[in-house]
Amino acid sequence: MPGKLVSKISNRKCFTLKAIDTVKTASSRLHENHVGCMPILDEHQKVVGIISERDLSQLIHSERFNTNLTIDKIMSKNLITCDLNTSVTELMELKTDKKIRHVLIMEENKLKGVVSIGDVVNHLINKYKEENKSLRDYINSY
């Protein structure tokens, strides 16, 4: 497990939004694409933030709620990133330390993807299934 890299566990298409998109657009795009977050890009395609279902949920319960509000007003700007060579172990530590579910994968200041807690869990499930099979095969060989 420690040797497995982020580049091997995150291979879904990365959907993005523009900072000028509305809350309504963000909500629709998250729903349509079955994702829990989307990075936000500026007019130069630079990542300037991230918005998640949690951000939208918090907004709905605030006095500022308005579906026409632009997402640059509510996006998280404190970006937590990793690179393609980050190990799964390092990624799990980062997610735990920062109490986050999504980490942006960046390489040379370019967005390469997003790795979610679900990606990590699926990786671990597959890892343990393989390990379980190997142990059963070993035991049954005697």
Map each language-model feature to its residues.
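A contiguous, well-structured "functional interface" segment within a domain
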Residues: 1-36, 139-141
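Tandem CBS (Bateman) regulatory domains
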Residues: 1-12, 52-81, 85-96, 117-142
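The conserved cystathionine-beta-synthase
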Residues: 17-34, 41-44, 81-99, 106, ...
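Acidic (E/D-rich), amphipathic helical modules within compact regulatory domains
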Residues: 28-62, 71
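Conserved beta-strand segments that form the floor/walls of ligand-binding pockets within enzyme
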Residues: 39, 104, 116
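Short hydrophobic beta-strand segments in globular cytosolic domains
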Residues: 47-48, 106, 111-112
